[in-house]
């Protein structure tokens, strides 16, 4: 089965990068309640206002339920001045994936 991965870029408004990071870090785990298999929140090292929320689902309908669900809708309303609009996501088929296990000490530091 080819899973789908949603990429949703955010661009924080002036001086709101840390606030947006906290909001996305709080929101992302909620995707698991909607059937997500994995989520990641990325913050650019080159441009600290640039973020990407990446969430993997088996079905696009699960993403739709999460995106239009109560928690995500409330986050968008409460934080609407913290990021540039519109929010435009794209749905991707995951056609290949590889991963090396991280050193356990490093994983603990990142958690």
Language model features by range: what are they?
Residues 72-81:
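Outer-membrane beta-barrel domain signature
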Residues 1-51, 58-70, 85-111:
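Short S/T/G/P-rich N-terminal loop/turn motif that feeds into the first structured element of a domain
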């Amino acid at each position: 089965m080819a899973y789908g991965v949603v990429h949703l870029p955010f661009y924080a408004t002036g001086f709101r990068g840390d606030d947006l990071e906290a909001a996305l870090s709080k929101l992302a785990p909620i995707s698991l309640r909607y059937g997500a298999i994995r989520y990641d929140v990325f913050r650019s090292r080159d441009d600290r206002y640039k973020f990407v929320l990446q969430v993997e689902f088996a079905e696009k309908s699960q993403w739709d339920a999460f995106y239009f669900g109560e928690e995500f809708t409330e986050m968008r309303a409460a934080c609407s001045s913290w990021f540039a609009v519109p929010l435009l996501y794209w749905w991707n088929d995951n056609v290949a994936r590889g991963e090396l296990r991280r050193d356990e000490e490093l994983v603990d530091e990142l958690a």
